[in-house]
């Protein structure tokens, strides 16, 4: 679930100006960015774009180096801090990721994505009390944000807190009724709680929204 929420919130491709492409296309785009950057090595905009392609190709170290350069020139660059935190987390550099999130929050108190990223990072880094306090604060500050509820639900599932997790996924669904990820996660919670009929209802709803039934075959098998 954590990976799902990070993908939803970080929106790496969209936020960095990248679009869905094949790996070959991505490598071509990266190569072009490198060539242009060679003529404009001080361009922070170009370095941010190159880092976007590095992220798309999961070249975490190269992306980090670009964000390092940008932040040496502009230490309050919000986007660079945010994405470097993500890149640091992907490399297992949790201490550095935490510092980036915390620095970002000092610059922009209440920054939604940074607060969420920090809560999920602390959950992953075995800091359960901090993580839960942070995600509860996020939900309290954003009571109409579906992602906040879904993120808390994901943390609760990891802790086997299935009743509150179902509540949070239900709230997320109420706020974003056609989000298939939220419904699938609620179906999972219901299966974990032994409520197969209700889990199947969530799967049926997803099919009704256009998700191919064939994509859910394994989930339907669990509901038998």
Task: State each model region's role.
Residues 18-21:
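Boundary of Sec targeting at the N-terminus
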Residues 24-29, 192-224:
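Terminal, low-structured helical/coil segments at or just beyond the last alpha-helical repeat
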Residues 44-45, 78-79, 112-113, 146-147, ...:
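Helix-start (N-cap) detector for alpha-helical repeat units in TPR-like alpha-solenoids
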Residues 23-32, 57-69, 90-103, 125-137, ...:
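Structural signature of tandem alpha-helical TPR/SEL1-like repeats
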Residues 55, 82-89, 123, 150, ...:
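Position-specific recognition of the canonical hydrophobic site in helix A of tetratricopeptide repeat
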Residues 4-14:
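Sec-dependent N-terminal signal peptides
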């Amino acid at each position: 679930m954590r990976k799902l929420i990070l993908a939803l919130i970080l929106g790496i491709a969209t936020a960095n100006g990248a679009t869905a492409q094949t790996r070959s296309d991505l490598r071509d785009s990266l190569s072009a960015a490198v060539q242009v950057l060679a003529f404009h090595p001080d361009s922070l905009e170009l370095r941010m774009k190159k880092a976007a392609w590095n992220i798309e190709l999961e070249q975490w170290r190269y992306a980090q180096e670009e964000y390092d350069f940008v932040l040496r020139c502009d230490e309050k660059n919000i986007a660079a801090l945010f994405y470097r935190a993500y890149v640091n987390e992907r490399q297992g550099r949790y201490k550095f990721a935490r510092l980036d999130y915390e620095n970002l929050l000092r610059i922009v108190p209440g920054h939604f994505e940074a607060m969420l990223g920090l809560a999920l990072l602390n959950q992953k880094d075995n800091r359960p009390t901090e993580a839960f306090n942070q995600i509860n604060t996020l939900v309290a500050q954003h009571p109409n944000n579906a992602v906040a509820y879904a993120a808390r639900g994901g943390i609760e599932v990891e802790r086997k807190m299935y009743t509150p997790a179902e509540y949070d996924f239900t709230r997320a669904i109420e706020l974003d009724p056609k989000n298939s990820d939220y419904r699938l996660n609620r179906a999972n919670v219901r299966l974990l709680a032994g409520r197969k009929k209700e889990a199947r209802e969530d799967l049926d709803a997803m099919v009704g929204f256009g998700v191919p039934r064939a994509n859910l075959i394994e989930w339907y098998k669990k509901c038998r």
